[in-house]
Amino acid sequence: MSAGGEHLKDEGTRRQVVLAGGIAGLVSRFCVAPLDVVKIRLQLQIHSLSDPSSHRNVSGPIYKGTISTMRAIIREEGITGLWKGNIPAELMYVCYGGVQFTTYRTTTQALAQLPHRLPQPVESFVAGASAGGLATAATYPLDLLRTRFAAQGTERVYTSLLASVRDIARIEGPAGFFRGCSAAVGQIVPYMGLFFATYESLRPSLATVQDLPFGSGDALAGMIASVLAKTGVFPLDLVRKRLQVQGPTRSRYIHRNIPEYRGVFNTLALILRTQGVRGLYRGLTVSLFKAAPASAVTMWTYEETLRALQAMEVAAQKDE
């Protein structure tokens, strides 16, 4: 897709787009799973790293930075601790990727049929926001399960994926699967809109540049777009994680002192009052480390998979 700078929305059949999007999400998730676990652990940590007095009566671990957190997890929980929550996350990424790319393609094609075309960046923003919002809502229960498993320490809150679904449904009801969903949609809509608008703007010019880092213009455009969009909406991502672990099991995760939060605005206000503005950006560094390669891997895998599927279709037609 890089060659010639054609747009993401113009290529592939619906089946090819769904399959390529799903595979891209699967590969990307597996590669960045350890960084995702580290990010979640840092986001759920409420005590101040610069104030030793806040560490009193803290029964859980005190993480300081990406590398030291990763080492602590390996030391206390083994190497597999870095892939906690990977099963629901893989399911989420596959479904998310398929819904996202299909919705993006469908929306942009619909916008192209309007009597008066919107400016290209506006079309990309609308399509990206629609794709992100729908994909987030459709896969949110899996996102919540991913967070809860990643937040487990050596004491297991849930013994298995099926057990977690059963327990949440029985104790918290259907609404329990959607804790923090409003923050997620509020985060992902502008994030995906900004991501795709930036990505589509950068791709044509980067497609003609030789010897780019990360192998291709698609990957570099995806990385730059992800970093810019992720930084802008990160506080809502942190709020989402804090809300996802609310409920009767709140005190049983790796950080046992997570406060009780009630809604997005209450969570934002409480974090600002007790932890300051910096509290809204805990885990941002590792989030950017994760977001950039994740988006680069996602877009590169999507492009290459789509190209391979199209080549297979052409070859099959020739054999007929």
Swiss-Prot record:
| Solcar-type repeats, residues | 12-110, 119-205, 213-308
Lipid bilayer topology: Multi-pass membrane protein
InterPro entries, per the entry? Mit_carrier, Mitochondrial_sb/sol_carrier, Mt_carrier_dom_sf
Q: Which residues cross the membrane?
A: 17-35, 91-107, 125-145, 180-197, 219-239, 283-300
Q: Which GO terms describe its cellular component?
A: mitochondrial inner membrane
Gene Ontology terms: biological process: transmembrane transport
State the compartments where it is located.
Mitochondrion inner membrane
Residues annotated as coiled-coil are none
Give the keywords, sorted. Membrane, Mitochondrion, Mitochondrion inner membrane, Repeat, Transmembrane, Transmembrane helix, Transport
What task does this protein carry out? Answer: Mitochondrial transporter that mediates uptake of thiamine pyrophosphate (ThPP) into mitochondria.
Q: Which PANTHER family match?
A: SOLUTE CARRIER FAMILY 25
Family in the record: Belongs to the mitochondrial carrier (TC 2.A.29) family.
Which protein, by its recorded name, is this? Mitochondrial thiamine pyrophosphate carrier 1
Organism equals: Aspergillus terreus (strain NIH 2624 / FGSC A1156)
